[in-house]
């Protein structure tokens, strides 16, 4: 009887530890907003004025067409980075790089690897909170080109629809680290196999203000392609040490990474310059692709980012954000992985050497 009670007690302890790990969260949390706030327009002339009249802002704000009719609630839906259960980080290595590595003062992955056209793509997540999936899929697509010399676009839809609860809640938000883990154990098909657009040419949420998470089909839209053969994998998942030198070294050596940050109301108004938070409430967490860095003419160090709100937002779809101060938590948790050669037929470049950055 005593042995049975001991086993029962141990089982209870392990169950409790499991629950604590499952619900112990890490990451970005949004403010609790009132219904009145959620129903108000996200774009405000007052915010534009406050930013543009601030001599120390370092960036310009505007009422851009992308969110001209959107409420705060509709804008918030796009911010799909959820606080991540800490269990997802168990066993995930934190990568650092040789501090003596000499890095350029400015770097842009688009020009470093000009053969990789995917790096410069600006996509549109529509009305779905799928930023966590876009940041991951776009970065891995770029890394396949950098590593293997092949331009491919991987499928956001596969990750969004088929990863399930492990990755979060699909269009209602997810976990960037879990997206990269999905690449390792399940792989992700190409955009050609499982596109993010339906047969009417409407982006998955483009037609509806609250598009539901698509269903996982595990079948290519073209009968000429097999789902299993279209899968592309990563061989590792890791976070990058949270300091500018290591983040720069990772991008310089391996290509773009996925980063997350806290979005405030003023960010919706970004037009140009080096963003830093000036005014407005914390709306939620957003994930994007980090493709480079530099220093502005005013002497402000910045990260160069590719967003997925189409080219009508920001600076032709891109934005710069202050570097070295962990602005809005941007340097907290860069996530990445290395592409696998499984299912890949390497492009013959006439050399056994891997492509490297040209700077």
Curated annotation (Swiss-Prot):
Disulfide bonds join 116-145, 128-171, 162-216, 163-167, 193-220, 202-207. It is found in: Vacuole. Its main location: other. GO terms for molecular function: cysteine-type endopeptidase activity. CDD domains: Peptidase_C1A_CathepsinB (cd02620). Its EC number is 3.4.22.-. This is Cathepsin B-like protease 3. It comes from Arabidopsis thaliana. The gene is CATHB3.
């Amino acid at each position: 009887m005593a042995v049975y009670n001991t086993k029962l007690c141990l089982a209870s302890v392990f169950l409790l530890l499991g629950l604590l790990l499952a619900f112990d969260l890490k990451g970005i949390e949004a403010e609790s907003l009132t219904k009145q706030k959620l129903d108000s327009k996200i774009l405000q002339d007052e915010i534009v004025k406050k930013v543009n009249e601030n001599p120390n802002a370092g960036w310009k704000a505007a009422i851009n067409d992308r969110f001209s009719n959107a409420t705060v609630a509709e804008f918030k839906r796009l911010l799909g980075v959820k606080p991540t259960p800490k269990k997802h980080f168990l066993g995930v290595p934190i990568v650092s790089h040789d501090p003596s590595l000499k890095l350029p003062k400015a770097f842009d992955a688009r020009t470093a690897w000009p053969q990789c056209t995917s790096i410069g793509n600006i996509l549109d997540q529509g009305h779905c909170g799928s930023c966590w999936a876009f940041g991951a899929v776009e970065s891995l697509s770029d890394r396949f080109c950098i590593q293997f010399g092949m331009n491919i676009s991987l499928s956001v839809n596969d990750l969004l629809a088929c990863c399930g609860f492990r990755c979060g809640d699909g269009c209602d938000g997810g976990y960037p680290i879990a997206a990269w883990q999905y690449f390792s154990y399940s792989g992700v098909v190409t955009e050609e196999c499982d596109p993010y657009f339906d047969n009417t040419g409407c982006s998955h949420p483009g037609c509806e203000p609250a598009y539901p998470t698509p269903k996982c089909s595990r079948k290519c839209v073209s009968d000429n392609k097999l789902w299993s053969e279209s899968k592309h994998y990563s061989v590792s998942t890791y976070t990058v040490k949270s300091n500018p030198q290591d983040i720069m070294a990772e991008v310089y050596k391996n290509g773009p990474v996925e980063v997350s940050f806290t979005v405030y109301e003023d960010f919706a108004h970004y037009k140009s310059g080096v963003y830093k938070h000036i005014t407005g409430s914390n709306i939620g967490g957003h994930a994007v692709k980090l493709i480079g860095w530099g220093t502005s003419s005013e002497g402000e160090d910045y990260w160069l980012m590719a967003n997925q709100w189409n080219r009508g937002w920001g600076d032709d779809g891109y934005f710069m954000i202050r570097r070295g101060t962990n602005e809005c938590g941007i340097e907290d948790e860069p996530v990445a992985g290395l592409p696998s050669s499984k299912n890949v037929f390497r492009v013959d470049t006439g050399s056994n050497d891997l492509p490297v950055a040209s700077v």
